[in-house]
Amino acid sequence: MKNGFRQSMAWLHTWTGLLVGWLLLLIFMAGTASYYREEISRWMRPELPSSNVSIDVAAQRAVDYLQANATQAENWFVTLPQPRNPAMQMFWRLPPELADPSRGRRGGFGDATLDPNTGQALKARETRGGDFFYRLHFDLHYIPVLWARYLVGFCAMFMLVAIITGVITHKKIFKDFFTFRKDKGLRSWLDFHNVSAVMALPYHAMITYTGIVTLMIMYLPWGVKVAYPQDEDKFFSEAFGGMPEVTAPAEGRATPLPIAQLLDSARAHWHGVEVAGFTVSNPGAANAVIDIRQRDGKRLSTDTPAVRYDMVSGALLEETPPSGGATATRGVLYGLHLARFADWGLRALFFLSGLVGCLMVASGVVLWAVKERPKHAKSGRIGFGLRLVDALNIGTVAGLPIAFAAYFWGNRLLPLDIAERSSAEANVFFYAWGGALLAAFIWPKRMMWAWQLYLGAAAFALVPVVNALTTHAHLGITLRNGDWVLAGFDLSMIAFGAMLALCGWRMQRWTPPLSAAEKKKRAAAAAAPKAPVEAAEAAEAEASA
C-alpha cells in the first residue's frame, strides 16, 4: 500500500474494484436488464395477446374460469393484466387429500394463463423471461441461493467501498468529468472511467447501497437473534406482517357478490388507485373472503397495500396495517432499487444510468490491464496475472453481450415441448458465455476483442430476424399495430447491435500508443549517427540528385 491518505485510497479503490469487477459486471448488466423484465417476459411469450378489456371484465373472466376448473381449491390467486404485462395468470391451492404426490411440492397447486379478451386458457411457451435476469442479479445460477446472496452482498460492499474511495482519490473528479483526451492510451481510459463514474454517481451510490439494504437482515442477523432469541418468526411477523392468514375452514355455501363490485370498493378505499390482483380464501363458501392488492406505480415503497372483504356481504374486514418507521424506510429503499414506481420516462433514465454503471465497471477492469502492460513490456514478457485479467476482460466485457443475445435466440429456437425448457434457455446463456471465456483464455489478444464484439453485434442485430422467422409478432406487424412494447424490444436489439459493431470497428482499428520509454528509444534511434555504408549511400544519392 502506498504512503499518504489519498494514495492509500487509490490502492484500495483499485483492488476492491478489480477483485470483484467481472462478477460485478454480470450483476450490473442483469440488474439493468431487470428494469424491463416485464417487457422482456412479454416478448419471450409471443403467444400472449394484448389486453383490450377492462380490469373488471378480466377479473370476472378469471372468476368464471376458476369456478369451472378449481371448485375444490382452498385458495385462488389471480394476477390481473397490467399495462406492462397483459397476461392474466392464476394458480390455486388444493386440499392435501387432492394433491398429486408425484409432482412433489407442485402437486398441491394448479395454474393457468388466460387470454383476458376471451377468458380462454392459453398455452404459452415455458420461459423465465425477464425474471431470469432479475434472479440472476442477486441469486446467480447453479449455486445454492444462500451462498449466492452472500457472494453478491460481498461484491456490493466492495462496490460501495470502491465508489467512496474513488471520490476521495479524484480530488478533481467534477473537473475531470468534462475532460476526455482521445487516443491517449492510459489517459483516455482513465478519462472514460471518470466520466462514466461521475455521470451517474448518485445512481451508482444509491443502487449499491439499496442493494445491500434489501438483504440487510441476512447480512446482519445478530440484532434479531438478540432481541428474538427463541422466535425469529415473531420478528418478521411484527416487522413485515400484513393481514393475518385466513385459517378458518370453509363453512356452507353462498353466492358471492360480483367481483366488479368488490374491486370498486377497493378502488374507492384507495381513492381511485387501480387493482393489481386478488386472493380468494374458501371460494364459494359462506365465509369466503377476498384480499385485493393495490397496483404498483403510485408509491416509492415496495410495501403493497391490500384490503380484505367478505365476499358475500361485501363488508370491509381489515386492511394492511401501517408500517413502522424502520420498515417503511426499508420499503422505500427497496423500492428505489427496483423502480417499480417509475413511469416510462423515469424507467428509461434508470436503465440508461444502469448502462453507464456497466461502462464504469468495464472501463475499470480494462484500465488496470492498460496501466500494467507497460510495466510488463519492460521485462519483455507478460506475466500470468496480466494474461488472466486480459482473458477475463475479453470474455466478460465482450463475452457477456453474446450471452445475453444467445438467451433471446434460445427462446425462439429451442423446441417448445422440451422438458425444463426455461432451464434450457438459461443453459444457453451460460454456454455462450463459457464459450466466449474459453476463446479469450486460448487467445487473449487485441483482435479477440474485435471478434467477440462483432459476434455480439451480429447476435443482437439478428434477434429481430430470428423473431420474424419463428413468430407472428415481428416488426412488420407490431409497428403497424402500434404495439410499442414488442416493437421497441426488436428496435433495441438493433440499436445494441449497432453499438457493439461500432466498438468492434474501433477496437479493430485501434493502435496502442507508444509508451514513453518506446518513444524515447525511437527518438534516440532516429537521432543516432548513420552507419558509414548508409552515409555513403546517402551522399551518393545526394550527388546524383
Regions found by a protein language model. Name each.
Residues 1-545:
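Conserved histidines in hydrophobic membrane contexts and catalytic metal-binding motifs
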